[in-house]
C-alpha cells in the first residue's frame, strides 16, 4: 500500500491530531516526520483529552506503530516525561520507536533559544523557547548530535565538545551568560541511554519494508504549511519543512510512494506568535472564536490569534502540498454567528490578488476581500452526513470547498473522533 501524509494547511493547530487519531485504527504505522516538542496537538478519545507534544497522535491507536522520524529533533527528557504521563493514564506506549538518525535537542539549545528571543526584543519570532530552532541550526551546520550518538560515548563527547566551542563563545561574549560544561551535557545524554536503546530503529528501512508488505503508513506532519521555512511567512516560521515534501524527507519514504496528501484546515483561521495574518480579528468576535474554539496553545498556553477563513491561503497550501483532500475541522465553533465572512482575495495597495502575493512586503500589506455567508444556530455536533447539516452550514462548507480548489473529504463537527462527517474515505476513496 502507498503512504498517506497529513499536513496542516494554515499556521498550525488545525486539528491534525484528530485526523490522525480518526485514521489510526486503519493504519499500521504513524510517523512524525518533522518538528519536536514545540508543536502540541490535542486528541479526544471517549471524552478523554490527551495533549501530545513530541509523540505522534498514533500513540493512542492500539494497532498502529508510532515512529518519531529522522526529520524530528528530540528532547529526551521531554520524550520520557510524555511517555510516563500517558502510561500513568493507562495508555500503552510500548510500540513507540525512534529513528536512529533523528537529532537531539541539548540543554544548550534551549538556553540559546531563550536568550536569543530576549535579545531580539520587539523583533522576536515568538518561538516556544524549547530549543527547536537551534537544534535544527546545528543539524544544518553539521554540528548536531543524533540519537545513535548516545550509544557511543567517544563520538558523543567529541560532538558535544565541538559544538560547545562555538556556543560558549556566543553565550559568554555576546549574551553575558556562563559557559556550559561539556561533561555535564555528555552525562545528561548518557543518563537516557539504557531506556532509549530498545526504542531505536532504522526507521527508513522499517517503513519501506512495511510498504513493500502492503501495510499502510500515515505520516503526521507537525506545524503547518505557512510555518514552513521555505513556503511559509518567512521569517515568522519554524525551522523545518512541515509540508508534504518535508514529510518524505523526514521519514525516508520516497515521494512516489505517497498516494494521498491530506490538508487539515479549520473552518476559520488561527495563528500563534508573531507574523502577518490578513484576516485577524481584533474585536469581540476574535475573543469569541478564541473562547468558543478553546484557542490556547497546548505547549505554551498562549492565546491563539483568531480570524476568518482565508481561501487564498487554502488554495496556496493545496498547490504547495499537492493536496488530494481537505479535512475541515471546528465547523461547530461557528454555530451562532449571524454572518460569516470568508476571504476570497487580497487588496494590496489597490491591486486585487487572487493568489498569494510574491513578496513578504506585499503580504504584510494584504487587506482581505470578503464574501459573506449566512450563519446557522442549530447544534451540528450530531451531524454525520452533509445532509444532516442545516442548509446554511452546508452552503458554507460547499462554498469553502469551491473556493479552496480541493475536495472536502471530512468535516469535523466536534472535538471527539466520532464527531466527523466523512464525505470521501480518506484511505481508499
From Swiss-Prot:
UniProt-annotated binding residues for GTP: 12-18, 40-42, 304, 330-332, 412-414
Function description: Plays an important role in the de novo pathway of purine nucleotide biosynthesis. Catalyzes the first committed step in the biosynthesis of AMP from IMP.
Top-rank EC class of the record's enzyme: ligase
Source organism phylogeny: Bacteria, Bacillati, Actinomycetota, Actinomycetes, Micrococcales
Protein name (database record): Adenylosuccinate synthetase
Positions that bind substrate: 298-304
Protein's GO biological process: 'de novo' AMP biosynthetic process; IMP metabolic process
Pathway(s): Purine metabolism; AMP biosynthesis via de novo pathway; AMP from IMP: step 1/2
UniProt keywords, alphabetically: Cytoplasm, GTP-binding, Ligase, Magnesium, Metal-binding, Nucleotide-binding, Purine biosynthesis
Family: Belongs to the adenylosuccinate synthetase family.
GO cellular component: cytoplasm
Residues in coiled coil: none
Organism whose genome encodes this protein: Paenarthrobacter aurescens (strain TC1)
Amino acid at each position: 500500500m502507498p503512504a498517506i501524509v497529513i499536513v496542516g494547511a494554515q499556521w498550525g493547530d488545525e486539528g491534525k491530531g484528530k485526523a490522525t487519531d480518526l485514521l489510526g485504527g486503519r493504519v499500521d504505522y504513524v510517523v512524525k516526520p518533522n518538528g519536536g516538542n514545540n508543536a502540541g496537538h490535542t486528541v479526544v478519545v471517549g471524552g478523554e483529552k490527551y495533549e501530545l507534544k513530541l509523540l505522534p497522535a498514533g500513540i493512542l491507536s492500539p494497532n498502529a506503530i508510532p515512529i518519531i522520524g529522522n526529520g524530528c529533533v528530540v528532547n529526551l527528557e521531554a520524550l520520557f516525561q510524555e511517555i510516563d504521563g500517558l502510561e500513568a493514564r493507562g495508555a500503552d506506549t510500548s510500540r513507540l520507536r525512534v529513528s536512529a538518525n533523528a537529532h537531539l535537542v541539548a540543554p544548550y539549545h534551549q538556553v540559546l533559544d531563550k536568550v536569543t528571543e530576549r535579545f531580539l526584543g520587539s523583533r522576536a519570532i515568538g518561538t516556544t523557547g524549547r530549543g527547536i530552532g537551534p537544534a535544527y541550526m546545528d543539524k544544518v551546520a553539521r554540528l548536531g548530535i543524533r540519537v545513535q550518538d548516545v550509544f557511543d560515548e567517544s563520538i558523543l563527547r567529541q560532538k558535544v565538545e565541538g559544538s560547545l566551542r562555538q556556543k560558549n563563545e556566543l553565550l559568554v561574549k555576546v549574551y553575558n551568560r556562563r559557559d556550559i560544561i561539556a561533561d555535564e551535557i555528555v552525562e545528561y545524554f548518557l543518563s537516557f541511554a539504557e531506556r532509549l536503546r530498545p526504542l531505536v530503529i532504522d526507521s527508513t528501512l522499517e517503513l519501506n519494508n512495511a510498504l513493500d508488505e502492503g501495510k499502510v503508513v500515515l505520516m503526521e506532519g507537525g506545524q503547518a504549511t505557512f510555518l514552513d521555512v521555505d513556503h511559509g511567512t518567512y521569517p515568522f516560521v519554524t525551522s523545518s519543512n512541515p509540508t508534504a515534501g518535508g514529510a518524505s524527507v523526514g521519514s525516508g519514504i520516497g515521494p512516489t510512494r505517497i498516494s494521498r496528501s491530506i490538508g487539515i484546515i479549520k473552518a476559520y483561521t488561527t495563528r500563534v506568535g508573531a507574523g502577518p495574518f490578513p484576516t485577524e480579528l481584533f474585536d469581540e468576535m476574535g475573543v469569541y472564536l478564541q473562547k468558543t474554539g478553546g484557542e490556547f496553545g497546548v505547549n505554551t498556553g498562549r492565546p491563539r490569534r483568531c480570524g476568518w477563513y482565508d481561501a487564498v491561503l487554502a488554495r496556496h497550501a493545496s498547490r504547495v502540498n499537492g493536496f488530494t483532500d481537505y479535512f475541515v475541522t471546528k465547523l461547530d465553533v461557528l454555530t451562532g454567528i449571524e454572518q460569516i465572512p470568508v476571504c476570497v482575495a487580497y487588496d494590496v495597495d489597490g491591486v486585487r490578488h487572487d493568489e498569494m502575493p510574491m513578496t513578504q512586503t506585499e503580504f504584510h500589506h494584504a487587506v482581505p476581500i470578503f464574501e459573506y455567508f449566512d450563519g446557522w444556530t442549530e447544534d451540528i455536533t450530531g451531524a454525520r452526513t452533509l445532509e444532516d447539516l442545516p442548509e446554511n452550514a452546508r452552503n458554507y462548507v460547499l462554498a469553502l470547498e469551491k473556493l479552496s480548489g480541493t475536495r472536502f473529504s471530512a468535516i469535523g463537527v466536534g472535538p471527539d473522533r466520532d464527531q466527523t462527517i466523512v464525505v470521501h474515505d480518506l484511505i481508499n476513496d
